[in-house]
A protein has these predicted regions:
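Feature captures C-terminal
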Residues: 1-171
Length: 171
């Protein structure tokens, strides 16, 4: 457990608007507070199984995320969402400054490693999910607007997982 969660962060919750959550997803393409690209230019967030998004890896900074769904519905930029994560991230760690803008932030008192061990002991054997939550899509028309009678080509990538033990795609 310590090899996977070595930092002993507490689990916190906070409330973000949809716009703030989308901004946090944008911050996976890293810049520091001064706008400089750090030594790790991309850090992908782990997300709950009910959240997915598409992105354009070639887009300008701040414009990578092209769609987000929560529970199969489009993210409402004005709605508030309650999220949970590690205290380090919700304080803006690893350049995820959008998380620090959350409100009504609460410390659950649970340590990440201990909660993970407890979850595994209560839910074993675990069944991993192999679905993608982030898919790269390029070729989306500027502004996301499509005019009737016109055509365009979309390219999709990052459709399959490449981790050790993931079953081969059959479709």
């Amino acid at each position: 457990a310590n090899a996977v969660l070595p930092f002993l962060n507490n689990l916190w919750t906070t409330t973000l608007t949809g716009a703030q959550f989308k901004e946090a997803l944008e911050q996976q393409w890293q810049t520091d507070a001064d706008g400089n690209v750090p030594s790790r230019p991309y850090l992908q967030l782990g997300l709950s199984h009910n959240v997915s998004y598409t992105y354009d890896p070639n887009a300008a900074q701040g414009n990578h995320i092209t769609s987000v769904t929560v529970n199969g519905k489009p993210l409402d930029l004005k709605r508030e969402y309650r999220i949970g994560s590690f205290s380090f991230l919700l304080q803006g760690g690893d350049n995820f400054r959008a998380f620090a803008a959350g409100k009504d932030t609460k410390d659950t008192g649970l340590v990440d490693r201990d909660a993970w061990i407890d979850y595994i002991s209560k839910n074993s054997p675990l069944k991993p999910r192999y679905d993608r939550r982030a898919v790269a899509v390029t070729g989306i028309p500027a502004g996301g607007k499509v005019t009737a009678g016109t055509s365009f080509d979309l390219q999709f990538s990052k459709l399959t997982l490449t981790s050790l033990g993931v079953p081969a795609e059959t479709k």
